[in-house]
Amino acid sequence: MSIEINNISKYFGRTKVLNDITLDIPSGQMVALLGPSGSGKTTLLRIIAGLENQNAGRLSFHGTDVSRLHARDRRVGFVFQHYALFRHMTVFDNIAFGLTVLPRRERPNAAAIKQKVGQLLEMVQLGHLAERFPSQLSGGQKQRVALARALAVEPQILLLDEPFGALDAQVRKELRRWLRQLHEELKFTSVFVTHDQEEAMEVADRVVVMSQGNIEQVGTPDEVWREPATRFVLEFLGEVNRLSGEIRGSQLFIGAHHWPLDLAPMHQGSVDLFLRPWEMEVSTQSSDRCPLPVQVLEVSPRGHFWQLTVQPIGWHQDPISVVLPEGNIDAPVRGNRYYVGGLNARLYSGNQLLQPIALAQSA
């Protein structure tokens, strides 16, 4: 079941929380709505579910306008972060609940409900816990029950609001893998909200990065990671070093140090330079490629590389992060002095990416 979102806006009072959102979600895809608090991702999810109404725009499922359709008639399953299980019901009864309250003409008989719930219990690997109550379950088990309950009514679309946010790190990883395997098996259309970048990258077919009620970028996990469309996406996803510089002619100056550029750009003046820690080059000697002196503050061995925190010497106030591959130089120790640089820097003037600009291989 595909989802088509066309120019949807939402206000809470006078505050606009969604700004003309347009997004197409193909049938069978798992899509992550990723962004910081206040980005509008949960509001958009609730509009898809029918738990909120948009002020403008159109929402369609497989070409049919459902904008004014009640939530109960949308055939959407919803999984909440804090499970929302009925404490007085057993696991079996929690999963069966949605089936038992269907209109009489659609409601399965008792035998069919028992069979359906039994299948779901096996699917979520909780068949041995059918008679337990929520208070007797772990967080991960509760979330599996919540997911089975959502799937019981065979929804066209499954929506999940930070489904693993209340769980510890190891359980989150296990459930992420399990959910992805379940999606591959059942091929349902799914949209989930998260602020966990690792979760979005691991589970989703496509990632929708949101900020302040706007969509910043839509793409595969690899696309949004390697080719961020905006400065916000670049700074939001993963760790990145931001340095202040100035372009003068065909030179990029950072403090008293400079890099040659491939050509003199149209833009002259102040810029921000962004480099991922693993994009930094490290040398024991100053060069055109590595002109910036640093001193090592912290060394964290990571097997085939070292994670370094280094203090710029005279050209930047705050420490920066550097990933040093094993074998490039002798094992680093705290207090060592090196020179850093990087050819894959992205240069911004405000929110404008400066293209085409590249750091020259040599002067």
Curated annotation (Swiss-Prot):
<dbReference type="GO" id="GO:0102025">
    <property type="term" value="F:ABC-type thiosulfate transporter activity"/>
</dbReference>
<comment type="subunit">
    <text>The complex is composed of two ATP-binding proteins (CysA), two transmembrane proteins (CysT and CysW) and a solute-binding protein (CysP).</text>
</comment>
<dbReference type="GO" id="GO:0016887">
    <property type="term" value="F:ATP hydrolysis activity"/>
</dbReference>
<dbReference type="Pfam" id="PF00005">
    <property type="entry name" value="ABC_tran"/>
</dbReference>
<dbReference type="InterPro" id="IPR027417">
    <property type="entry name" value="P-loop_NTPase"/>
</dbReference>
<dbReference type="GO" id="GO:0015419">
    <property type="term" value="F:ABC-type sulfate transporter activity"/>
</dbReference>
<keyword id="KW-0764">Sulfate transport</keyword>
<keyword id="KW-1003">Cell membrane</keyword>
<comment type="similarity">
    <text>Belongs to the ABC transporter superfamily. Sulfate/tungstate importer (TC 3.A.1.6) family.</text>
</comment>
<protein>
    <recommendedName>
        <fullName>Sulfate/thiosulfate import ATP-binding protein CysA</fullName>
        <ecNumber>7.3.2.3</ecNumber>
    </recommendedName>
</protein>
<keyword id="KW-0547">Nucleotide-binding</keyword>
<keyword id="KW-1278">Translocase</keyword>
<dbReference type="GO" id="GO:0005524">
    <property type="term" value="F:ATP binding"/>
</dbReference>
<dbReference type="InterPro" id="IPR008995">
    <property type="entry name" value="Mo/tungstate-bd_C_term_dom"/>
</dbReference>
<comment type="function">
    <text>Part of the ABC transporter complex CysAWTP involved in sulfate/thiosulfate import. Responsible for energy coupling to the transport system.</text>
</comment>
<keyword id="KW-0067">ATP-binding</keyword>
<keyword id="KW-0472">Membrane</keyword>
<dbReference type="InterPro" id="IPR050093">
    <property type="entry name" value="ABC_SmlMolc_Importer"/>
</dbReference>
<dbReference type="InterPro" id="IPR005666">
    <property type="entry name" value="Sulph_transpt1"/>
</dbReference>
<dbReference type="InterPro" id="IPR003593">
    <property type="entry name" value="AAA+_ATPase"/>
</dbReference>
<feature type="domain" description="ABC transporter">
    <location>
        <begin position="3"/>
        <end position="237"/>
    </location>
</feature>
<dbReference type="GO" id="GO:0043190">
    <property type="term" value="C:ATP-binding cassette (ABC) transporter complex"/>
</dbReference>
<keyword id="KW-0813">Transport</keyword>
<keyword id="KW-0997">Cell inner membrane</keyword>
<dbReference type="InterPro" id="IPR017871">
    <property type="entry name" value="ABC_transporter-like_CS"/>
</dbReference>
<feature type="binding site">
    <location>
        <begin position="35"/>
        <end position="42"/>
    </location>
    <ligand>
        <name>ATP</name>
    </ligand>
</feature>
<dbReference type="InterPro" id="IPR003439">
    <property type="entry name" value="ABC_transporter-like_ATP-bd"/>
</dbReference>
